Amino acid sequence: MESEQLFHRGYYRNSYNSITSASSDEELLDGAGVIMDFQTSEDDNLLDGDTAVGTHYTMTNGGSINSSTHLLDLLDEPIPGVGTYDDFHTIDWVREKCKDRERHRRINSKKKESAWEMTKSLYDAWSGWLVVTLTGLASGALAGLIDIAADWMTDLKEGICLSALWYNHEQCCWGSNETTFEERDKCPQWKTWAELIIGQAEGPGSYIMNYIMYIFWALSFAFLAVSLVKVFAPYACGSGIPEIKTILSGFIIRGYLGKWTLMIKTITLVLAVASGLSLGKEGPLVHVACCCGNIFSYLFPKYSTNEAKKREVLSAASAAGVSVAFGAPIGGVLFSLEEVSYYFPLKTLWRSFFAALVAAFVLRSINPFGNSRLVLFYVEYHTPWYLFELFPFILLGVFGGLWGAFFIRANIAWCRRRKSTKFGKYPVLEVIIVAAITAVIAFPNPYTRLNTSELIKELFTDCGPLESSSLCDYRNDMNASKIVDDIPDRPAGIGVYSAIWQLCLALIFKIIMTVFTFGIKVPSGLFIPSMAIGAIAGRIVGIAVEQLAYYHHDWFIFKEWCEVGADCITPGLYAMVGAAACLGGVTRMTVSLVVIVFELTGGLEYIVPLMAAVMTSKWVGDAFGREGIYEAHIRLNGYPFLDAKEEFTHTTLAADVMRPRRNDPPLAVLTQDNMTVDDIENMINETSYNGFPVIMSKESQRLVGFALRRDLTIAIESARKKQEGIVGSSRVCFAQHTPSLPAESPRPLKLRSILDMSPFTVTDHTPMEIVVDIFRKLGLRQCLVTHNGRLLGIITKKDILRHMAQTANQDPASIMFN
């Protein structure tokens, strides 16, 4: 997603009538300004929708929350719009949770009044399960549709089925009687483009025509994908996981999970995968599932009017996305917990589990691959692993960690260059160039020409008696009449050595192209390319170990396990371990990754090799930098995301970080009873801050509360329309009792109802490690700094991110949202 597009979505900040506060996120969270009021306030429940009325809560720094004055006592009627959020703002977690508790209390208090109220109470209680059920159903159905369409369009680059145009290559030959076992992919019904256009099935002319058509279809699919993204849904590009992590932490990006994004992402994901680019559909499927969760949450007031509750649905949706991407429901739940979710209560765990279950069930019912499995590359191994194999498994872990560190640095450097040069202004041209280079280089090599998922399937598959792949071209010394379950290790034939050279070239090609492909303006996942790179490396290592064991079975490391004629090495297992190691090196996932790969293979006995490889890859990757690829892209885009994995060990104080600094202008504040409507409107027009502390007087600087810019604007506009006598010279009163005014004075405007009476505060001597902990665990966006009750300044989430960058010797300006 281009940060410029996010920037331009902001409103013009000098317009008083624009309710939003600033045109850039830098100003949204800047200095003395505040993004949004994070604390509980009297407008907590002004909006349980647009019109619901709530309760005022008071909160101390100890964190206790108690019910106080009801808003009905303060407002003649609720003000529509108060308490909602603008684009690119961060939600108020505490206020949203208080709104939900008050809504729950209100429903419980009424449910015994009538059967209708009891029905509403039951509907509210079950709405969480209903929304995750709908999300799971939609995610599974869309994933099946994407899988089927992507397979068909991928085969369209090579030819077409004349008997049924909607069949892919494999389905076309299922019903053919002319298909032989050795050439099972050839049948009269399937015609290559060379056969259709020039009437030749073999020869140089046929090869060149197929080459040209392959490039033509690849470029057509890529161009159509990037054009649809650019014109209809700019947010549909990329994997979406960095933005989803940011959204789940409380940031608001309007439209990122909308219906247009869902529709365009679903269509362009098929096109991008079919174009042959070095990308996968698994990451974007998480984005697709979250779009479904967001859309269905609007059907239920419990979630549509509460941003914190909506994020519980999105956490469950991300679990459903991984469930259908890998056929791993439990792995999906753990992925949501480990990788993307910011707030994950126990209830969300259960609902995530249920959403993943429903999504997997729907996908299994659709059976998109015709193998009764949820993924194309499901495999089963029947031989155990041996202790000496831990050494090559750990080596694969080292390779995965080195690949992950290299990829993150190279890809971030390229994306940063794209942002800072003219090349980034031509996203369509970039996609066309990358697609053209990919297609031209990929076609001659059969392993790069394959769909990446099919490549992984071939690399994972163990060599059995029915395999015809060149990877299984071993010299067979078996007695042909002997029926065997496990084929013993055999010397490699010419086909195996030829395949190894082709795999080495494919490995180099995949490494280079994935760096330049991830981040272009089409839907692009990273899971499958990373797994393919690891699977290629793993298969090569597996064949090498297998041949070593065959020719040197008398070595002491092999003697105890590998007897002559025994099947002791499974190269496909090494491919699986390598795939997990490389994906772990890039994403730094651990537990969820092992469970996902274990669910792919269905083999409990291979968990230890997977754990060894994944932990090794994480340790090696962490030695070069603790960030995974998603955190690196979050930092590149400057999203206000406080990573819970980072430790803050410096000894600075709140006074060192707060704004205003020594040479800054003074803090923009409101006084509780001696400012007019014109004064407040002028302050709103002249500043870009999102909120203003309210003090007793300029002399005392005693803190009274905090008022949001948006709420002030809405309240004043509403008062001018609905209350007689409110003019520019009307006194604005935030105090409980209106001060005595001269008889000729215009009617005062009481705004105590929108004032947060308990803004979260820290003293100037609070250590910053405690402040950072408070921001992370409570999800704060800002807190006020006081000294003996007198207001000194403010600390926002951006101030903390800026400070953490400074302590890490980074340029603070480089991490800000631009």
Curated annotation (Swiss-Prot):
GO terms for cellular component: axon terminus; cell surface; cytoplasmic vesicle; early endosome; early endosome membrane; endosome membrane; external side of plasma membrane; GABA-ergic synapse. Residues 241-248, 313-325, 329-337, 572-586, 590-601, 602-605 dip into the membrane without crossing it. Residues 1-125, 625-818 are cytoplasmic. The record marks E282 as: Mediates proton transfer from the outer aqueous phase to the interior of the protein. A motif (Selectivity filter part_3) lies at residues 525-529. GO terms for biological process: adult locomotory behavior; chloride transmembrane transport; endosomal lumen acidification; negative regulation of cell volume; phagocytosis, engulfment; photoreceptor cell maintenance; positive regulation of reactive oxygen species biosynthetic process; regulation of pH. The record marks E339 as: Mediates proton transfer from the protein to the inner aqueous phase. The keyword Protein biosynthesis does not apply. GO terms for molecular function: antiporter activity; ATP binding; chloride channel activity; chloride:proton antiporter activity; PDZ domain binding; voltage-gated chloride channel activity; volume-sensitive chloride channel activity. Glycans are attached at N177, N451, N479. Pfam families: CBS (PF00571), Voltage_CLC (PF00654). InterPro entries: CBS_dom, CBS_dom_sf, Cl-channel_core, ClC, ClC3. A motif (Di-leucine internalization motif) lies at residues 28-29, 46-47, 71-75. Expressed primarily in tissues derived from neuroectoderm. Within the brain, its expression is particularly evident in the hippocampus, olfactory cortex, and olfactory bulb. Highly expressed in aortic and coronary vascular smooth muscle cells, and aortic endothelial cells. Also expressed in tracheal and alveolar epithelial cells, and intima and media of the pulmonary vessels. Expressed in bronchus and colon (at protein level). PANTHER family: CHLORIDE CHANNEL PROTEIN, H(+)_CL(-) EXCHANGE TRANSPORTER 3. Belongs to the chloride channel (TC 2.A.49) family. ClC-3/CLCN3 subfamily. This is H(+)/Cl(-) exchange transporter 3. It comes from Homo sapiens (Human).
